[in-house]
């Protein structure tokens, strides 16, 4: 079996269906004898350029080990699913299991302390004086 890295982007209006799609795709991979080495849900992200007049999409990354028949089934599933805007399937030499750069950046952002609240802007004294008169 060969190793593959799969990234697919889902229409932002269908973000709530992503978990079901991931379960369906991972089930089809494991039923065919493949394994999922890494699965990351990157969430909604800005696109580099508009696709079908959309500026955001929900990203999912998978690293799997499977046969060619599984890849063909996934390509068909992506092609006939209108929610999937784009997909990319790349063959890799080895199984990639470490956390991706995108996921690391997201974890670091969560670990940082939240920003201090902004000070409230007070109304101008002139406006208060005219209101009293």
Swiss-Prot record:
GO cellular component: cytosolic small ribosomal subunit
Ranges annotated as biased composition (Basic and acidic residues): 106-125
Region described as Disordered: spans on this chain: 106-133
TM spans (from-to): none
Keyword match RNA-binding: yes
Any single biological process term in GO: translation
Source organism superkingdom: Bacteria
One Gene Ontology molecular-function label: structural constituent of ribosome
Key words, A-Z: Ribonucleoprotein, Ribosomal protein, RNA-binding, rRNA-binding
Family, as annotated: Belongs to the bacterial ribosomal protein bS6 family.
Known function: Binds together with bS18 to 16S ribosomal RNA.
Protein name in the entry: Small ribosomal subunit protein bS6
Protein source organism: Psychromonas ingrahamii (strain DSM 17664 / CCUG 51855 / 37)
């Amino acid at each position: 079996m060969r190793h593959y890295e799969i990234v697919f982007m889902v229409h932002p209006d269908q973000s709530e269906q992503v978990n079901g799609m991931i379960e369906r795709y991972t089930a089809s991979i494991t039923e065919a004898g493949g394994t999922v080495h890494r699965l990351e849900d990157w969430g909604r992200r800005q696109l580099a350029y508009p696709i079908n007049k959309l500026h955001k999409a929900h990203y999912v990354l998978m690293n799997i080990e499977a046969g060619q028949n599984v890849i063909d089934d996934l390509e068909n599933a992506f092609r006939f699913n209108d929610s999937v805007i784009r997909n990319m399937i790349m063959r890799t030499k080895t199984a990639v299991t470490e956390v991706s750069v995108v996921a690391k950046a997201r974890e670091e952002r969560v670990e940082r302390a939240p920003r201090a609240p902004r000070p409230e802007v007070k109304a101008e004294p002139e406006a208060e004086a005219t209101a009293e008169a």
